[in-house]
Amino acid sequence: MTSNLEAQLLALRQEGEKAIAAADTLERLEELRVNYLGKKGELGALLRSMGQMSAEERPKIGAIANTVKESLQTSLDQQRVALEAAQIQVQLEAETLDVTMPGIYSPQGRIHPLNGIIDRALDIFVGMGYTVAQGPEMETDYYNFEALNTPPDHPARDMQDTFYLPDGNLLRTHTSSVQIRYMEREEPPIRVVAPGRVYRRDNVDATHSAVFHQIELLAIDEGLTFTDLKGTIKVFLQAIFGDLPIRFRASYFPFTEPSAEVDLQWNGRWLEVMGCGMVDPNVLKSVGYDPEVYTGFAAGFGVERFAMVLHQIDDIRRLYASDLRFLQQF
């Protein structure tokens, strides 16, 4: 009985190795694996007859069976590797693309000067503890004007021409509307900076555009003063322009009181770079804040203005022309 089963196992190994070597597809190889090593395969069928053997015969046959199984598994693995390699080679030969050829060079992109200013400014304010907030560019009259202490009959509305839409909404004229929406959602203390596109009915020339970018900041807390505002602006401008002289001039904005313009001495002359002021109590009331408890300050600047000063650009239209000869300088 032992010698007969031993001969059958050796014959099975020989037959299996021959069949595996002849397999020419991965599908055929899988069929052979199931046929020889599967639960209902030929090796399993032979091993089930070991139950008729004596206890002395089983160890010898078991060792032979393990050897046969390992040999067949090794043959299967080797043939699988060979077939997969052949399959890849056929695929490569069939493809029209030669993967060994050098690729097509794609020139590295550059950061647009406007995006560079925005990223730099936001990094500075985030480092000072401010949160970045976004809002809709199509706004309601309430958020763009009324909540900012500019009712319908307020003379300050004559200061800026607005793009009104047929449904009564408008294209925002500043990102201050984002601050109102943010204050409605959050409780003080607040430190928020709002970047984004704004729209005004300006005639397009070297220094004006109907669409441009603003960044505005807002801080609301107990005990904030104009000194805090000045300190914040000085830190920001020094981080952008370096340690240059700065001055504050009295000005007027409907949503701040007192208000000021910020000038920077650049190349021997004073340049207006920002507007700022203490948040008007009426604005605080419109969002449900108690002006007897909280005070705040706000400031804003045009991104295009900063880009033109820093990069000595003489025409704002260059920033939108998509002229690679110009943009590759940055």
Curated annotation (Swiss-Prot):
Keywords: Aminoacyl-tRNA synthetase, ATP-binding, Cytoplasm, Ligase, Magnesium, Metal-binding, Nucleotide-binding, Protein biosynthesis. GO terms for biological process: phenylalanyl-tRNA aminoacylation. Pfam families: Phe_tRNA-synt_N (PF02912), tRNA-synt_2d (PF01409). Its EC number is 6.1.1.20. It catalyses: tRNA(Phe) + L-phenylalanine + ATP = L-phenylalanyl-tRNA(Phe) + AMP + diphosphate + H(+). Its cofactor is Mg(2+). It is an enzyme of class 6 (ligase). Binds 2 magnesium ions per tetramer. Its main location: cytoplasm. CDD domains: PheRS_alpha_core. One of its GO terms (molecular function) is tRNA binding. It is found in: Cytoplasm. GO terms for cellular component: cytoplasm. It comes from the Bacteria. Mg(2+) binds at E257. NCBIfam families: pheS. Tetramer of two alpha and two beta subunits. Belongs to the class-II aminoacyl-tRNA synthetase family. Phe-tRNA synthetase alpha subunit type 1 subfamily. This is Phenylalanine--tRNA ligase alpha subunit.
